[in-house]
């Protein structure tokens, strides 16, 4: 291997590392809402529906931002987008810490930070990493996007301990400052290679209008299978689990610290599951792999229904669900690259992420409304089980086709 090639490889892995960190901070800020729900509701007198609406509204703004951001990645690269997304996350979360009314919290967390969540996001990271790798692409995407869980593995259990000694507002300020501090670091250290700049300029010059590229996607059966399975992915992960697992665990009688430890354990296995799924996506039939992930995730909800009073079952669920949580991301990104083309990878992943966010909005709000109406989460888990099984069936309908060689569609 030549010195120049070694430097290129090192540069590509540096991008992977800082993409990991960006997702770690962004996703930790997003998921921390589930941890502060109880103290925030007690202080402000809000219902579970009101606090769940903040998560749901944030997902809607993520959905609105995702395709636009994805299109911008294709044309301008990820450096500015990741750093500005982190700045929006940090600023929004700091403002949310000072909220005293629901509209103030919605504006700061759901709108400002929500747009940041949709910008410093897995679809941006998976796109920039895919464009920097040919060999070991699935592994690289798996490692980079594992930041979405890696940060939560560390931050959420620590935050739970901090909440034992201070209020939720102080904790939120600390998270926001972390995001603001990382934003300029990402901008300075994720430097595009000369070849990447030239390729981006070529894509910009050759790029068809966004409407034409969207038309190509909407005519593709593969896109619809990926989109609707990813919509369900949002319901069953960011929707019901990210927003409601810790409150549900506390409702079942577990202390907040124990509940957050279980969430941290889930994220530990989540991280490993993402890397493993990325590695497997380079080696086996990807539609079968993706479908199996959804089905096994769905079956884990059966365990969740019976955790009350049984710490062993809580741990068992955390391990099983963790392995099959975000492990859909690298496999979905790999299929998007091979079946829909690298030239519109950003737009494709943006559209898929929009679907995921809309599903998460449905799941988060559904959990809050059903809990307020029925004083139980059981129907939430039943819906999650059924929809996850449906997502698996959708993925089995996708044809494996590696031989297309990451082709770019003619309309792009």
Which ranges hold each PLM region?
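C-terminal transmembrane helical hairpin of 12-TM major facilitator-type secondary transporters
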Residues: 258, 264-270, 276-335
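Extracytoplasmic gate region of multi-pass secondary transporters
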Residues: 33-37, 221-274
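Cytoplasmic helix-loop-helix junction between adjacent transmembrane helices
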Residues: 110-146
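Intracellular juxtamembrane helix-capping segments at the cytosolic ends
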Residues: 40, 119-133, 327-340
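Hydrophobic core of transmembrane alpha-helices in multi-pass small-molecule transporters
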Residues: 104-120, 231-232, 313-327
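Residue-level signature of mid-helix packing/kink "hotspots" within the transmembrane helices
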Residues: 31, 59-67, 153, 267-275, ...
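Conserved MFS/SLC helix-loop-helix module at the cytosolic interface between two early adjacent transmembrane helices
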Residues: 64-102, 281, 287
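Helix-loop-helix hairpin linking two adjacent transmembrane segments in secondary transporters
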Residues: 148-195
